[in-house]
């Protein structure tokens, strides 16, 4: 064993191995390994492990079952170092007789002490070849504060800043399994409220297998506890409208939406899952006619389109009159979309005036919240980046990190009541090992969070007295018990009720279906 120093770090270079069977199809010889001798608890660090292909089969890249990847051993498939595998990488092949160096970031455990570090190759038949030497790495105690301090903004003008504890869970209900040609299983729903002579309804937009807008009743609520949906009632379909599609039939609704009763207009949004081209029709409007038909009314491109792909909402009149010159439509919600440079690295929101149906572009947006390139929203540090080159800042601790390429925001609500205020962005954050593996973004796990922002600070951004990236959430709260990703939320200011739709919230046969959870704001 030879002690080396690389980039100022103390490393162990191991050049020994164990005997392997000759002439096997899959076989490998250990060559060398570079791993820090000592790391701090929770530290993210880089390793290099070189193996030689001594078998007869070429090691090809792995996409489905991870052949020719390194797997943790002692014991097998342990996740002491944040993950149990290190991939070979996209576009790589290792012919017989050739060496290959596996490079990855790993994460130290939280517990101080000596921990075993050992790996072995894995292919279609299973583990094969020599293991790396059984090395002990010392993990030292991390010094510093355990959690960031939460400071709730002071009340002003009789309005307190809302926190997670202000929301009292009232109950939940199911979404209809089908409506027209829409199915609940894979749909990324949009949702908004409508007042009718028969009471309140929800508009829901299914996106799979075909887009379908419908109106549903709001049933009696029951509690969703420990994943049990037995007592939950299902909303009843009252009317099926059909597919929301823009005038040139090049975009259909797949984001958020908001209903304008006075104009009988549904404003809805569109985003593209993988887009490198020019402007797309982010905002669209469809008139719902009294005879049950729909008329495509307007379609608009907008500046900073990837900041605004998530959805559309209506701002409270009190806020719009004070800060945005009366502009009361808002587009958002930010976070990751493919090709990230133009995206907001965190929640985003901008105000616009109701657009002219004859115009094809919104020319003026009033930014309220967003994180341009070079800035980022905060997030918990319960993750690490294994191999990606964008939005890849490693966390400083288990509690402190920066928005990553596995973090999404598809819904938000703006609340301005007589006694309380706040903007809430609903974010899905990747956890554990995050990777860009064979052209696919992956994460070991995910958690849903509520981000609470002071609307007065958003107003300061609108007035150009504050940069949007300087607005930070005063509370980031994990919502652990409700399952699934939030794709829609709407606030009923008359009844002080918040409706939150989470897709894939419970198992329904071979599919996962959504639930709507309802919360009352405490007085």
Language model segments and positions:
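Short, surface-exposed loop/turn segments at beta-strand-coil junctions that are enriched for proline
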Residues: 107-113
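Short acidic, flexible loop segments centered on an aromatic residue
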Residues: 56-79, 121-122
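Low-complexity, acidic Ser/Thr/Pro/Gly-rich terminal tails and inter-domain linkers that flank the onset
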Residues: 21-39
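Sequence/structural signature of beta-propeller domains
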Residues: 148-523
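Asparagine-centered strand-capping/turn motif at beta-strand->loop junctions
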Residues: 51-55
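Short beta-strand and strand-turn-strand segments in soluble, beta-rich domains
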Residues: 27-30, 73-89
């Amino acid at each position: 064993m030879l002690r080396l120093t690389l980039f100022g770090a103390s490393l162990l270079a191991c050049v020994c191995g164990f005997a392997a069977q000759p002439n096997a199809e899959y076989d490998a010889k250990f060559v060398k390994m570079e791993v820090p001798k000592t790391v701090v608890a929770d530290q993210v660090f880089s390793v290099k492990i070189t193996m030689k292909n001594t078998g007869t089969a070429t090691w090809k890249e792995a996409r489905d079952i991870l052949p020719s990847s390194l797997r943790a051993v002692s014991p097998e498939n342990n996740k002491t170092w944040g993950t149990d595998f290190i991939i070979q990488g996209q576009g790589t092949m290792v012919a017989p007789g050739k060496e290959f160096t596996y490079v990855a970031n790993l994460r130290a455990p939280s517990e101080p002490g000596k921990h075993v570090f050992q790996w072995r190759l894995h292919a279609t038949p299973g583990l094969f070849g020599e293991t790396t030497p059984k090395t002990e790495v010392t993990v030292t105690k991390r010094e510093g504060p355990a959690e960031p301090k939460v400071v709730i903004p002071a009340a002003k003008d009789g309005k307190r800043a809302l926190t997670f504890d202000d929301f009292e869970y009232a109950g939940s209900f199911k979404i209809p399994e089908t409506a027209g040609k829409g199915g609940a299983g894979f749909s990324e729903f949009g949702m908004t409220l409508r007042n009718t002579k028969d009471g309140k309804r929800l508009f829901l937009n299914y996106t799979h297998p075909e887009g379908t807008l419908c109106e549903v009743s709001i049933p009696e609520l029951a509690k969703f506890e420990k994943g049990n949906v037995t007592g939950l009632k299902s909303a009843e379909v009252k009317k099926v409208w059909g597919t929301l599609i823009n005038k040139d039939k090049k975009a259909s609704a797949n984001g958020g939406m908001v209903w304008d009763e006075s104009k009988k207009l549904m404003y809805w949004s569109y985003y593209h899952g993988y887009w490198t081209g020019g402007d797309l029709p982010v905002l669209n409007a469809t008139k719902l006619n009294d005879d049950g038909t729909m008329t495509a009314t307007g379609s608009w491109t907008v500046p900073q389109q990837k900041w605004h792909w998530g959805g559309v909402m209506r701002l409270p009149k009190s806020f719009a009159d004070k800060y945005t010159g009366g502009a009361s439509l808002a587009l958002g919600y930010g976070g990751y979309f493919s090709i990230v440079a133009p995206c907001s690295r965190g929640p985003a929101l901008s105000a616009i005036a109701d657009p002219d149906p004859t115009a094809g572009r919104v020319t003026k947006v009033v930014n309220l919240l967003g994180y341009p390139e070079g800035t980022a929203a905060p997030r918990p540090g319960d993750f690490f980046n294994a191999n990606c080159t964008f939005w890849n800042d490693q966390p400083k601790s288990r509690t402190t990190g920066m928005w990553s390429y596995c973090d999404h925001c598809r819904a938000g609500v703006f609340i301005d009541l007589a006694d309380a205020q706040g903007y809430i962005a609903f974010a899905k954050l990747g956890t554990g090992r995050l990777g860009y593996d064979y052209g696919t973004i992956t994460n070991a796990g995910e958690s849903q969070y509520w981000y609470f922002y002071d609307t007065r600070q958003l107003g300061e951004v609108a007035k150009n007295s504050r940069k949007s990236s300087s607005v930070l959430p005063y509370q980031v709260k994990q919502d652990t018990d409700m399952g699934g990703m939030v794709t829609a939320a709407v606030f009923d200011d008359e009844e002080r009720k918040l409706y939150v739709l989470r897709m894939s919230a419970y198992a329904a046969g071979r599919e996962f279906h959504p639930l709507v959870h309802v919360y009352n704001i405490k007085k």
